[in-house]
From Swiss-Prot:
It is found in: Cell surface; Cytoplasm; Cytoplasm, Cytoskeleton, Spindle. Residues 1-87 are annotated as: Disordered. InterPro entries: HMMR_C, IHABP. This is Hyaluronan mediated motility receptor. The keyword Glycoprotein applies. Glycans are attached at residues 134, 279, 446, 467, 488, 509, 530, 561, 601. The lineage of its organism: Eukaryota, Metazoa, Chordata, Craniata, Vertebrata. Keywords: Cytoplasm, Cytoskeleton, Glycoprotein, Hyaluronic acid, Phosphoprotein, Repeat. Interacts with ANKRD26. Interacts with DYNLL1. Interacts with FAM83D/CHICA.
Amino acid sequence: MSFPKAPLKRFNDPSGCAPSPGAYDVKTSEATKGPVSFQKSQRFKNQRESQQNLNIDKDTTLLASAKKAKKSVSKKDSQKNDKDVKRLEKEIRALLQERGTQDKRIQDMESELEKTEAKLNAAVREKTSLSASNASLEKRLTELTRANELLKAKFSEDGHQKNMRALSLELMKLRNKRETKMRSMMVKQEGMELKLQATQKDLTESKGKIVQLEGKLVSIEKEKIDEKCETEKLLEYIQEISCASDQVEKCKVDIAQLEEDLKEKDREILSLKQSLEENITFSKQIEDLTVKCQLLETERDNLVSKDRERAETLSAEMQILTERLALERQEYEKLQQKELQSQSLLQQEKELSARLQQQLCSFQEEMTSEKNVFKEELKLALAELDAVQQKEEQSERLVKQLEEETKSTAEQLTRLDNLLREKEVELEKHIAAHAQAILIAQEKYNDTAQSLRDVTAQLESVQEKYNDTAQSLRDVTAQLESEQEKYNDTAQSLRDVTAQLESEQEKYNDTAQSLRDVTAQLESVQEKYNDTAQSLRDVTAQLESYKSSTLKEIEDLKLENLTLQEKVAMAEKSVEDVQQQILTAESTNQEYARMVQDLQNRSTLKEEEIKEITSSFLEKITDLKNQLRQQDEDFRKQLEEKGKRTAEKENVMTELTMEINKWRLLYEELYEKTKPFQQQLDAFEAEKQALLNEHGATQEQLNKIRDSYAQLLGHQNLKQKIKHVVKLKDENSQLKSEVSKLRSQLVKRKQNELRLQGELDKALGIRHFDPSKAFCHASKENFTPLKEGNPNCC
């Protein structure tokens, strides 16, 4: 190699702080370790300082080259990261839209649940009203049963038999009395006929004596008038007796008919008893059904309360999860800020490395001319190295914090995954239990509906029986009306008999007229007539006694007739009461039938509503199950991806920790090498400052120091200069190669850090804020205002 010879002026001109390269000698020693060695002097006691200085130069040059290479790689990585960030933002927006749709569905489900709850409350109110009406109807049934028992007590079989026996005995007595009286009357009539025959004979004999008896006719006529009155009274009594006998016969017929009616009424009462027993059984069945319905309602209320509690717990857990996500997002934002700070620190380090590289270049260009400047720059570099060391320590701390946070986030993700799985299992169990409860309730409801149908059929049969009894009562009333008509006919016949008696009275008057004609003939037989009058007086006495006895008997018969009429009136009243009770029972049965029809209609409507609600709930449950399965699959995929990413991150972190430890060791070695040199430079700087502050003598001292420095560092000849320059170039090339290696390593490290940061962002769902998209987030806009009962927001 040949090097051009520099002019002597350059080496001898004392320009600046340091002498020219040719103005000093270079002496090699065996104890030196670096490529450049210096002779010991009073200020420079250690030989390691030059070597440490050169090592620092190598590091600065390597860092500058590594930063240049890293800039080109970081641009590509930033482009890739921007693409990944955009893709992640799109995915996050899609997920937010899906979440908004799910929230809307949940709100719709809540509104439908509120509607169903309102319907159920209305059904419960209707049921309470029906239960109240049922209670009132049961009270009516109890009152009817009491009235029926009273009627049974009144019309018991023993009482009827006793009354019938008493009436039959009285009728037998009356019959015997009537027969004895008829016999006595027949005997008297025969005696009268015999007497009349005798009188006719006497009349034929006394025709001649009529003239004699005309004078006595006045008295006889008076007596005859009295006798006529008495005979009229007797005829009236006889007619009354005949009427009484006719009435007795009619009463017998009426009694027989009443006995038949009583038997029929007993049968009807038995049928009514059976129907009442059936009604009691039906009421018991209805009570059992109401109890079952109440149990079903309580079960349904319990299920609804459990569903509400579970929904509240789920909503609370969702709120807790959202709060946790918000906290994690805040932590992630803090981590992002820390990363931004670390990136800013790295950029500052890059700038510092660039400055150091520029300073190294200037130092290499002005190596020989500005050694003092080089020392000052070395001081600055050492200070910056301290700052860099501190920043590296901070970056290590940040990396450790990031590792801990990634571990904590991974643990939280595993916990969330476990919680989600447990909640899914609980939801599936809850859905299965809810479906089973719905099926059980449906079966119970079908059973109750079937029992209601049976009850309605039984009530219809009871209604038919009531209709039959009402028809029989109508027939009885018709019979009673026919009997009333017969009674009216008998009264009419009695009026006809009285008319006949009046005609007979007229005939009797005619006979009296004939008797007046015969009075003339009767005068002749006055004596005989006196005898006959005596006999007639006896007969009249007998007739009076008979009249008194017959009057007593007639009074007794009248009393018996009154008692019978009272009994008939009582029976008619009881029949009317029974008819009224039957009418009330018919009205109650009609009301029951109407209520049963209303219940059937309502039950059919409620069955349809329950079927619709169950079908809609089953569809919604299936949709929710499908959505949960899809979400589970998505979460599992995301967790698998996160696990892979965490594994990759752990590998990268292990590599980074290895590299950090390596660089730490290198830095410690450099720091140990630069410590003594730093102390000497500090002492030199202090001396320089003290000398610069002095006037006059300071310049001379500086010149002396410059000369001594030139003597120490000056070359004795050209060969030594060439060797020194060759050594410097070799050291420079070595430093450049080391700087390139360090830059490549730093680029790799930054790439790994960026990749890890992107994976962390993907795992935590955090994206960097784009200022161009400020106030334009469609997913975060509340298009619909929040309701009062919807505290959850997207």
